Structures are given as C-alpha cells and as structure tokens.
A protein has these predicted regions:
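Flexible loop/turn segments at secondary-structure boundaries
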Residues: 56-57, 103-105, 198-203, 240-245, ...
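Active-site clefts of carbohydrate-active enzymes
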Residues: 202-203, 304-325
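Active-site regions of oxyanion-processing enzymes, predominantly non-cytosolic
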Residues: 183-193, 305
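C-terminal beta-strand-rich structural cap/linker in extracellular carbohydrate-active enzymes
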Residues: 520-536
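Acidic/aromatic-lined carbohydrate-recognition and catalytic surfaces
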Residues: 2-177, 181, 185, 196-251, ...
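Beta-strand-rich binding/interaction modules
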Residues: 497-515
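Loop/helix patches that line or flank the sugar-binding groove of alpha-linked glycan CAZymes
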Residues: 5, 225, 232, 239, ...
Length: 536
C-alpha cells in the first residue's frame, strides 16, 4: 500500500467562534487560534481542521458562505489567515479548510444575481422549480422556499438562507474548482468536505444523497484541484458503508483520502428515529459490531477511514457515553485509547483532550444553534413540553460542542475578556481547563499526547490486521496483528467491574489508564479500565 502523510497524522478540529478570542468581543478569531499554536504543537497534532472562517452572515455559524475568498469580519481578515498559515507551518502543522459547496448563503453574489436576474448564468447555479415537492429540510420544514422576486421556489436542504447549488452546471463546478485552487495556492494542507454526498442530488427523483453523478463530480474535482498535490481530503458522508467508502477513498479511484462515516454515532439515538429521540445508554455490543465491520471490511489499501467521537455537530462524548462524575478522567482516557489504536486517521475536537462536557442549558434563550431552535419551535407547536425539549437539547443539541474552550480558571475560562461570550462558558471550567490539565502529569491531555505520538511512530497502527475478541457485553477488546507482532487493546466501557481473562505472559504495556497487574492477577477489569499491551 502506498503510504501518505495522513496515515500517521492526528487532526485537531477547531470551531473558530469558540476557540480563543484575541480582541475581547466574546467571539473566537484567527489571531486567537494563532496565539494557541504552541499549545497544539505540545499536543503533537499534524493538522488543524478549521470550521468555516469565510465571509458569512452566520445564519448557520459560517456554513452559509457569502464569499469563499474572504474572511468573516468576526474572525479577522486575510492577513490574519496568512499569518496563521505561516505560523502553523513553522510548527509543522497543516491547515485543513472546511469546503462547503453543497450550498451557499443567500447573500452570496451568485444567489443575489440569480434571484434578481432570472436570465443570468448564475440563475442555473441554483435549483429552481415552479412547484415544490415533498423534500424536507434537515433543519425542519419544507426544503423549498418561495422567492417572490422571480415567482419560483428554490431548494435548500438546510436553512432557507442556504440555497443548494446545482452541480449539474459545469460553469458552477469550474467556479468551485477555481476557488479551491485559490486556497491550495495559499499553502493549505487539504479540505474537509461538508455534506459532500449531497452534491449529486436529483430533487425531482427525491434523491438527496449518493446521486448517480456524485463520484463523477468528485473525480472531476480531484483532477481540477487537489489531485495534483499531496493534500488530505475528507468527505462528510452520513450514509457511507465500507463498500461506498472504497469508492470514495481507494487511491486507484482518484477521489478522496478518506471519509467520515457516522454509523457509530447513530447509536446515540433510537433506531430509525430523529436524533432528538436519544438512547439513554450505549449499546456496547452494537458499537463493537460497527467498529469491527469498518475495521475488517475496509481492507488495507482499498480505502481509508477516519476515527472520531466528537465534532461541532455532536454532543460531547463524555456526556453521551462516558462518565461526567467520579470517572470523568478515566472514562475520557478509556474512550480515547479504544478509538485511537484502530486503523484510520484520528480526529480530536477542541476540548476533548481535557475532557470537556455538555452544557447544562436551562432555557431556549441560552441557545444559538438554528437546528435546536427550529426543532424546539416545531415541537412546542406540536404540544411537546418545554421541559422535555430542553432535556433533549441538553443531551444531543449541537451547542454542547460549541461552548467556549476552557483555558484556565480565570474569567470566561480565559477564552475572552468580554463581559458576554457568544455562547455561555460551561460552569465547570474552574475544574476542567487546559492550565490544570497541563499541570497534572496524569491528566487526560497527556494520554492524548501519547496517543498522537504513537500514531506518528508506530507502523502497526496503520498496517496491522484487526480482530475483535469475544468478551462480556461491556468489554471491548481487540487485537492488532502484523506478521512480526501483536497488540492487545482492552477497554471496560462501564463503571462496573467486568471479567476479563487472558494470558498476558510477558506483555509490555504500550499505554493504559490503569495498572496491568490487578487485571492479570484477578482476571477482572475495574470501572473504565483501558490498556494496550504488546504481546511477546
């Protein structure tokens, strides 16, 4: 298998509004990110994925783009972006830009022209119909919005301020590739591609994802932009299977480096239900089956996967499947060890490395997220209780991931000097923050630091086979095996003691959140025990 730099990379995702505020306006910005590069270098990560920093009215926090080649005022300007690229490069950190080309903002020059001049070339950059069909928006309600100016409906799978682009138009596609090359010429390390599986949609046939021309478009994009460069490209593909992922990420196909698959994330809510109908407990046996499928069916050389628990759209993994009480640190380390020792490129979401948790939202006024607010409005109209809605939002709402990064125990967790931050700071910041994590050699941070270092240096993490072991329900154990060596990873995903008997003779500990001896002596795993050993 041909090796690429991203096989041994760990990527750190930054949500710019919430990372670090340099100018005291309560909103994170590019200068703030640059000021924290030394911290990220200490963690050891290879690249930063920046959620969108482009010019935007911020209807969906930057995923509604008005100008792809300008920076939103709240984040700074292009000089700040260039400075971030230069300073990151000095520290051997690549910058991965968020590519949002399923839709634009309705304030993008293309859409303004399309709306005002139905005869313009830009009109066909978007999808217009005389009558709507039954397609619905991800953010609730119809996916069609009537435009009084031109007397037609336009398609928006997200908010009505995010009109979908018409990828069947070759001029539109070329404009996208030109924009991508603008960023490639600036020296970025790649693209994370937002809902890329939607660009092949055929609305008249009710096809929203995985349309018949999807892979043709991605191949064309590859040839016209990043394919000539050694860049990381990762597609957000909610419906991907291992078979579909081979199509995207087999190097012979010349499409993408890897995808984000979300099958394990689906366990957060009840089967075939909206995300708001969340599961109160993790089904560990289902999690084992899903990871086993992805680790064994996406074979080495046939494609590549990403490994993640958190991102800007998901609840904090500790609040979902870990322990936010007495075992917070131990469960955070256990979840990290379990994930990072599989095959794939790991992604760390800001604050994950210090064990940040969900926010205790009490009222709708504390929220910012359009998805949560739209859901609450719709659910209230249908007679749901506010108490129940707030419980759901506290558990799975997107703002949980977006509260400000917790740097220290000072005002606003050291994120901002402002009297009001754009989202409230989690009240637990005095206990959970970077400063206290760095001061404690046993903190979650140093487990992540070690996992990042292992990924860079240990070839077996890329090459080794994966074998799931038969264990009790709450124990997740697997072996990574090459022709020369084998590594055993064992994690107790519960706060109860679990049986685990294995011949550990002459095993050498690689990383752990516990001691090996009690496990070998008693055949028992204590709450949230996690260990990786090299078998002799």
């Amino acid at each position: 298998m041909q090796k690429y730099w991203w096989h041994k990379a760990t990527i750190y995702q930054i949500y710019p509004k919430s990372f670090m505020d340099s100018n005291g306006d309560g909103i994170g910005d590019l200068k703030g990110i640059t000021s924290k590069l030394d911290y990220l270098q200490k963690l050891g990560i290879t690249a930063l994925w920046l959620s969108p920093v482009y010019d935007s009215p911020m209807d969906d926090n930057g995923y509604d783009i008005a100008n792809y080649e300008a920076i939103a005022d709240i984040f700074g300007d292009m000089n700040d972006m260039d400075e971030l690229l230069v300073e990151a490069e000095k520290r051997d950190i690549q910058i991965i830009m968020d590519l949002v080309v399923n839709h634009t903002s309705d304030e993008h020059a293309w859409f303004i022209e399309a709306r005002e001049n139905p005869e313009s070339p830009e009109r066909d950059f978007y999808i217009w119909r005389d009558e709507p069909n039954e397609l619905v928006s991800v953010f609730s309600g119809s996916a069609w919005e009537y435009d009084e100016t031109s007397g037609q409906y336009y398609l928006h799978f997200f908010s009505k301020k995010q009109p979908d682009l018409n990828w069947e138009n070759p001029q539109l596609r070329q404009k996208v590739y030109d924009m991508m090359n603008f960023w490639i010429d600036k020296g970025i390390g790649g693209f994370r591609m937002d809902v890329i599986d939607m660009i092949g949609k055929i609305p008249d046939q009710l096809i929203d994802t995985n349309g018949p021309k999807l892979h043709d478009y991605i191949k064309e994009m590859n040839q016209a932009s990043f394919g000539k460069h050694d860049l990381l490209t990762v597609g957000e593909t909610w419906g991907a299977t291992p078979e579909i992922t081979k199509q995207y990420s087999n190097p012979d196909n010349q499409e993408l480096s890897m995808v984000f698959q979300f099958e394990h994330i689906g366990l957060q809510h009840k089967p075939d239900s909206p995300k708001w109908e969340y599961e109160k407990e993790l089904d560990v046996s289902a999690l084992k089956a899903i990871f086993n499928k992805w680790q064994t069916e996406l074979e080495l050389g046939q494609g590549w996967n990403s490994l993640f628990w958190n991102n800007h759209d998901l609840p904090r993994i500790l609040s979902m499947w870990g322990d936010t009480g007495v075992y917070r640190e131990k469960s955070a380390k256990a979840l990290a060890i379990l994930l990072h020792l599989m095959r794939g490129t790991p992604y760390i979401y800001q604050g994950e490395e210090i064990g940040m948790t969900n926010y205790p939202f009490r009222t709708l006024e504390e929220l910012n997220d359009i998805e949560s607010l739209n859901y609450a409005k719709e659910a209230l109209e249908k007679g749901a209780s506010l108490e129940n809605i707030m419980d759901q939002i506290r558990q799975v709402g997107r703002d949980n991931a977006r509260t400000p990064m917790q740097w220290d125990a000072s005002k606003n967790a050291g994120f901002s000097t402002s009297d009001k931050t754009w989202l409230p700071v989690n009240p637990n910041y005095k206990d959970i923050n970077v400063e206290s994590a760095l001061a404690n050699p046993e903190s979650i941070f140093y487990t992540y630091q070690k996992l990042v270092a292992l990924r860079k240096t240990q070839d077996w993490l890329v090459d080794a086979d994966f074998e799931l072991l038969e264990t009790t329900d709450k124990v997740f154990a697997y072996i990574r095996k090459t022709k020369d060596s084998s590594y055993l990873v064992v994690v107790n995903l519960s706060d109860q003691e679990q049986d685990f008997c294995y011949d550990f003779e002459r095993a050498e500990v690689v990383i752990a959140n516990t001691e090996l001896e009690p496990i070998t002596d008693q055949g028992k795993l204590q709450a949230w025990d996690a260990i990786c050993v090299k078998m002799k």
